[in-house]
């Protein structure tokens, strides 16, 4: 991947832009400047029912495909339904749409790679809720990417492991959202003086003895640190990404930062346990016993299930992936029956099915006509 962290940040921010939904033909789509690089939008989804919004970009100079999932913007759909659902139910109502959009991006890149003979990289990004969706989809399809102040996906009910190097998750030290849950991938922490001051005034100290002697309040600190969650911390002249001193400050104050973030995650875990109830907690215990899934395994399982389902269907079943090809073969066989004065029967249907199966096995996409050998 040639994209830098600042490039991902620009795309995560651009995902908040309102666009007409649907797929685009890149040959007909104008290029747009995002963070100093030219991109074309391949697809945009904006579902007002669930609040999900995502955009697929094609970077012109490198032919890389990036899926950017939009973060928390609408209070009702995002904060109350999607964000709260991650805490209470360990699920995300927007995840199925995010996975579907990412799947289309991966399939598009694979098709283009076959045509050109050059591999096209696909990666993901997002801020806040969008960062959680980026982690979910990265694990689902075994992709790389970067997030910004994401709600960590490791606590969700998708059997996603915590840690690893598949993702880079950039977080502000006092951001309460990214502190509430473990992350898929590595975490890079940045701090500014105002955050350290807020943590200090909320009772947090560096060093075990100081932490023991001075009472602290994670919720008070979180309430004072809402500015830390904003995407602007990673953009333009305010960006902490290219300021080594922000990571150095975080390292110098790692004691109080870790204490604060650990307490917020503990509090979130308590809320999850209480609201999940007996059945929910039992399911969570089973998931912990089963352990996390390998990266890419969810997508492989879906593919295997689709193949199993399609192999059990007859070619003349409308759900079969070769059904349209069967209809073309059937139409051609019936035309030949009519030419010789024969009424179509079960044999005609079987012949059409055989022709369609052979054409599909040979890599064909459709049957336009059927001709008899002389």
Q: Could you tell me what each predicted segment is?
A:
Residues 20-122, 140-141, 151, 155, ...:
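A conserved cap/lid and substrate-binding interface adjacent to the catalytic center
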Residues 8-12, 332, 355:
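Short, Φ-rich (hydrophobic/aromatic) sequence segments
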Residues 67, 127, 145:
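Divalent metal-coordination and catalytic microenvironments
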Residues 12, 68, 171:
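Residues in well-ordered beta-strands of folded domains
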Residues 8-9, 122-123, 173:
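Mature extracellular "passenger" or substrate-interacting domains of secreted, surface-exposed proteins
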Residues 1-24:
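N-terminal low-complexity, Ser/Thr- and acidic-residue-enriched intrinsically disordered segments
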Residues 125-130, 134:
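Gly/Ala-rich beta-loop-alpha elbow adjacent to hydrolase catalytic centers
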Residues 58-64, 139-331, 336, 340-352, ...:
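Serine hydrolase/lipase
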């Amino acid at each position: 991947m040639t994209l830098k962290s600042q490039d991902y940040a620009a795309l995560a921010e651009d995902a908040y832009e309102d666009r007409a939904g649907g797929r685009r033909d890149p040959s007909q789509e104008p290029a747009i400047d995002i963070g100093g690089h030219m991109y074309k939008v391949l697809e945009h989804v904006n579902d007002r029912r669930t609040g999900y919004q995502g955009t697929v970009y094609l970077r012109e100079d490198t032919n890389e495909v990036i899926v950017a999932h939009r973060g928390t913007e609408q209070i009702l759909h995002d904060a109350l339904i999607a964000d709260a659902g991650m805490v209470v139910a360990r699920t995300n109502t927007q995840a199925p749409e995010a996975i579907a959009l990412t799947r289309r991006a991966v399939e598009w890149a694979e098709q283009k790679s076959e045509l050109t003979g050059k591999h096209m990289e696909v990666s993901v990004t997002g801020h806040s809720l969008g960062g959680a969706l980026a982690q979910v989809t990265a694990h689902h399809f075994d992709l790389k990417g970067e997030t910004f102040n994401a709600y960590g996906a490791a606590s969700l009910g998708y059997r996603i492991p915590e840690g690893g190097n598949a993702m880079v998750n950039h977080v502000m030290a006092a951001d309460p959202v990214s502190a509430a849950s473990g992350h898929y991938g590595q975490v890079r922490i940045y701090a500014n003086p105002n955050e350290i001051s807020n943590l200090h005034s909320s009772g947090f100290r560096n060093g075990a003895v100081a932490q023991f002697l001075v009472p602290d309040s994670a919720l008070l600190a979180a309430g004072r640190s809402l500015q830390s969650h904003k995407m602007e911390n990673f953009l333009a002249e305010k960006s902490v990404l290219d300021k080594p001193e922000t990571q150095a400050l975080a390292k110098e104050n790692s004691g109080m930062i870790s204490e604060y973030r650990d307490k917020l995650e503990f509090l979130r875990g308590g809320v999850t346990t209480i609201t999940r109830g007996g059945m929910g907690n039992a399911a969570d215990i089973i998931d912990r016993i089963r352990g996390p899934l390998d990266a890419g395994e969810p997508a492989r399982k879906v593919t295997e299930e689709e193949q199993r389902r399609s192999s059990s269907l007859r070619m003349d079943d409308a759900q079969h992936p070769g059904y349209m090809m069967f209809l073309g073969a059937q139409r051609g066989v019936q035309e030949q029956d009519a030419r010789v004065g024969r009424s179509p029967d079960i044999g005609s249907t079987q012949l059409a099915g055989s022709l369609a199966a052979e054409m599909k096995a040979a890599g064909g996409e459709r049957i336009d006509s059927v001709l008899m050998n002389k």
